[in-house]
Amino acid sequence: HLLDFLETGEICTIVGTALDNATESVETEPDHEKRLIRVAVYAQNGFVMLRFENYCAQEVELGADGLPRRNTHGGSDLRSVRAAAEKRGGTMTLHWENGWFTLRVLLPQKS
């Protein structure tokens, strides 16, 4: 019930885009043991966090807008995820470190 306050389309935009991008990224990994995707959704301190992580050996450089510089990890699609988060007063952040790409969507929790 953590996401009940979101419209179905918003959930599809966030979750669908995140999983599509993660899947596309790990498909190119030659080592099948490293084709890993982790997903977590939880509430904490009045917020709902959706976190998507995938193994990504090649560093993902982010531009000034916080999106990938190269057309990797669905740069244009991630704009729609950001828009969905911001519509609900939330944020989207991306991070790459030690072979892991992370997409986080933080939304204020509605009662």
Where are these regions (language model features)?
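Conserved polar catalytic motif of the HATPase_c/GHKL fold
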Residues: 13-24, 80
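Conserved short strand/loop->alpha-helix "switch" segment adjacent to the catalytic nucleotide/phosphoryl-transfer site
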Residues: 1-14
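Glycine-rich ATP-binding loops of the HATPase_c
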Residues: 89-99
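Short beta-strand/loop element within the Bergerat-fold HATPase_c
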Residues: 34-46
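Glycine-rich/acidic phosphate-handling loop/turn and adjacent ATP-lid/helix
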Residues: 46-79
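Detector for a conserved hydrophobic position within an alpha-helical segment of the HATPase_c
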Residues: 85-86
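A short, flexible helix-to-loop-to-beta junction within the catalytic ATP-binding CA
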Residues: 23-31
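Glycine-rich nucleotide-binding loop
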Residues: 58, 97-104
